[in-house]
């Protein structure tokens, strides 16, 4: 018991000490998910029961890694925008004495680009842009109600002849109370850039802290999910200098003052993500999510559309689970996610 308590104290101390890290940086792809299920439910973390077998949730919340993921294999593909695409593979393995592990590789391909001279004239040669993340995740249960986990990530970028490398870690804890509420606390991208060949300073990593909660209803197969993103930064409001939402007085040119209640509410809900997951039997799952902050940042004042919403479906076919989702990020296009998961042990005879 003392050993478990010591491990928990170490995890909480690490989370407390990283609040001062920067939010934004070159490595924003570290926060991108390739999981169709995660994308459908808001795109950040899943604060769900860690006694499940869904290896998709492990990359964003390592405290969900458990022995049920042993020999699980997951393949994901994301059709992003234009020629941009992402792919990922995950595999789980459990060792009795030290815990369960999930290894994953995510690769992003941004396409090929023509070189141009200073006047904008294109040349005949081209260059490519890509990035990758190699991740080793570990998770362990300290009790029937409490689990912890961590990710160790190596990230790299190649933009033409420019390259850079970084190392980062995520730490997480998940707690399930007696009323079947699930709570997860995750600190992501604690680390630093190791090297780059195009500037004299180091790029910051996009550190963030997230608090999530979920509740599965007792008499209905519906799970509600709530995530509070960016615990480390309160003010997320961006004042558009182009004033597309008519926030400035046209006569005086001054910013229209909002009430303190309006500012507080706007900031609060920019942190919030809400989602729901409905199980229709054993072989079909429907999902929907809403990200208010994404909607406020990406919406067009002239055509609002469904920006900020995400939705998806999951089906079990034979020994495979197939998940599809779509995230409405902009009125001019939205990414499509597909993930196929299986367990290799199920094919043994």
PLM features per residue range, with description:
Residues 21-349:
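Subset of outer-membrane beta-barrel
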């Amino acid at each position: 018991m003392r050993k478990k308590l010591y491990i928990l104290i170490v995890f909480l101390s690490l989370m407390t000490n990283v609040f001062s890290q920067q939010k934004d940086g070159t490595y924003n792809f570290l926060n991108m998910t390739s999981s169709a299920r995660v994308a459908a439910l808001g795109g950040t973390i899943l604060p769900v029961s860690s006694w499940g077998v869904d290896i998709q949730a492990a990359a964003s919340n390592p405290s969900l890694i458990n022995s049920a993921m042993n020999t699980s294999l997951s393949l994901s593909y994301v059709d992003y925008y234009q020629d941009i695409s992402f792919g990922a593979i995950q595999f789980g393995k459990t060792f009795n004495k030290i815990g369960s592990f999930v290894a994953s590789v995510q690769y992003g391909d941004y396409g090929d680009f023509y070189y141009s001279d200073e006047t904008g004239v294109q040349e005949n040669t081209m260059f490519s842009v890509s990035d990758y993340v190699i991740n080793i995740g570990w998770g362990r249960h300290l009790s029937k109600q409490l689990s912890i986990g961590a990710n160790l990530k190596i990230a790299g970028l190649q933009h033409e002849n420019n390259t850079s490398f970084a190392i980062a870690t995520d730490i997480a804890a998940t707690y399930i109370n007696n009323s079947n509420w699930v709570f997860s606390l995750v600190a992501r991208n604690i680390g630093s850039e190791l090297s780059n060949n195009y500037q004299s300073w180091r790029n910051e990593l996009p550190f963030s802290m997230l608090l999530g909660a979920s509740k599965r209803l007792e008499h209905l197969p519906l799970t509600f999910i709530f995530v509070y993103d960016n615990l480390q930064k309160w003010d997320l409001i961006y004042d558009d200098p182009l004033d597309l939402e008519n926030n400035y007085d046209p006569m005086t040119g001054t910013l229209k003052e909002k009430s303190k209640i309006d500012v507080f509410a706007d900031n609060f809900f920019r942190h919030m993500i809400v989602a729901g997951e409905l199980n229709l039997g054993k072989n079909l799952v429907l999902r929907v999510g809403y990200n208010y902050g994404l909607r406020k940042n990406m919406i067009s004042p002239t055509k609002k559309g469904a920006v900020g919403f995400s939705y998806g479906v999951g089906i079990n076919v034979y020994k495979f689970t197939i998940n599809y989702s779509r995230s409405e990020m902009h009125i001019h296009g939205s990414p499509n996610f597909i993930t196929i998961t299986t367990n290799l042990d199920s094919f043994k005879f």
